[in-house]
From Swiss-Prot:
The keyword Cytoplasm applies. This is Flagellar assembly factor FliW. GO terms for cellular component: cytoplasm. Transmembrane segments: none annotated. Its main location: cytoplasm. GO terms for biological process: bacterial-type flagellum assembly; regulation of translation. Belongs to the FliW family.
Length: 166
């Protein structure tokens, strides 16, 4: 049985040992970080809805992300994707991928944390390829987390198949 290759990287959370097989490649990079192509998802705490999408090459580049379906019904947010994006991700439907959104927490104002719905990050967990898919909709661009009730408490939402985190 083959063992996963562990590698050491410096992160925003300190030095971490990560599974090299869980690295996600972003062929186009991310908005503002176009030259950063390889990332890994790191748990902040077990069972916490927030993760760090950490650059493999730059310890300063780590984005706070969340599964939006932990905070809202799946029917309330469906990012639009074109055929080119689906082809690049090697999926035929959004249901085959994990959807993450960046989280903004203003300094000193954790109660004003917001989910950024305008630039979802879509990851094909099986192929380990990801893409940020900017949205051009008239819908809300962000939703403040204090106005949301975690979906897990109501048990009504379908959870997306989140990409495994380290």
């Amino acid at each position: 049985m083959a063992r996963n290759k562990e590698i050491e990287i410096d992160t925003r959370l300190g030095r971490r040992s990560v599974d090299a097989d869980k690295v996600v490649h972003f062929p186009r990079g991310l908005a503002g970080f176009e030259n950063e192509r390889d990332f890994i998802l790191l748990q902040i705490r077990p069972e916490a809805p927030l993760l760090i999408l950490q650059s493999m090459s730059n310890p300063v580049v780590g984005l706070l992300v969340a599964d939006p379906y932990s905070f809202m019904e799946k029917s309330a947010y469906a990012p639009a994707m074109g055929e080119a994006e689906k082809q690049l991700l090697r999926i035929s439907d959004l249901d085959e991928a994990a959807v993450l959104v960046t989280v903004t927490i203003p300094a000193g104002q954790p109660g004003e944390a917001a989910l950024n719905l305008a630039g979802p990050i879509v990851i094909n967990s099986r192929e380990r390829v990801g893409l940020q898919v900017p949205q051009c909709s008239d819908g809300p661009q962000q939703i403040y987390m204090h106005s949301l009730k975690p979906v897990g408490e109501s048990g009504q939402a379908e959870k997306s198949e989140a990409a495994p985190a380290e």
